[in-house]
Amino acid sequence: MGDRLRPLWDFSDLDSSELRFRAQLELETTDAGRAEVLTQLARIEGLRGRFERCDALLDEAEALGGAEARVELERGRRERSSGRPGAGLTEFEHAFQLARASGDDVLAVDAAHMLAIVGDTEAWTARAVEMAASADDPGVRYWLGPLYNNVGWSRYEDGDAAGALDAFKLALASRERDDPRPYEREIARYAVGKALRALGRADEAAAAHEECLAWAAAAGVEDGYFHEELAEDYAALSRDADAREHARRALELTPDDDDSSRIARLRSLAGDIDR
């Protein structure tokens, strides 16, 4: 049955997402439908760090009824924002149980994906992948992209670049097949390139990141991370002038309050220019 609300999301533009959800709220004709939309407005407030507003919207959704799994899922995400170890685990488990009981595999896999982040990573990832891979519903299969992406970054951070590459390739294949959002596809390609460079395959990494930038240019999208990775690729290939060019562009697109070590590395690649 898919997730009818997912197309309204743009996580890079919460304000526009909120406008779409508020417009959708006016179109809903049932309490259950309104409750579903309210949970997504609550998620937006949670992402903004406005937790009291998030809680109020979830309470409102819960009072309407009919969206219990979504309410628990978003309560879990809100709890996870506290940063406490294991925060959200109980809510995500409840959301998973509710979604499975109601036959909502989209929300069940979403909950399992969150449980893989806060709980037993391997067990919940395996369960979620099994559910998503065997599904006929593209709304369920969509979750293979985020799941493989999470596996890839976990392996990458553990120093397993080869394992990360395998997972990132699966994530990219899933994005190309099941996710209509081109930016998410290019983010998956970006990760593939990053793992390739970590394996000493900088020429292949550069080709991947050049493809990311070609899409961005055609779409009118500016992304400093694409330029940053290409600068690293070119530096590894001793293409110093090209590395400087892309490092400078990445610096132009990087906020002054960004991670200081990242800025220092970009300045080094750019030839220590003034910002």
Locate the predicted segments by residue.
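Residue signature of alpha-solenoid helical repeat architecture, marking inter-repeat boundaries
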Residues: 32, 66, 102, 106, ...
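Residue register of alpha-helical TPR repeats
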Residues: 36, 70, 110, 139-142, ...
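TPR/TPR-like alpha-solenoid signature
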Residues: 2, 39, 73, 109, ...
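Structural motif corresponding to the intra-repeat A-B loop/turn of tetratricopeptide repeats
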Residues: 11, 48, 82, 102, ...
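Amphipathic alpha-helical segments of tetratricopeptide repeats
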Residues: 25-26, 59-63, 93-100, 104, ...
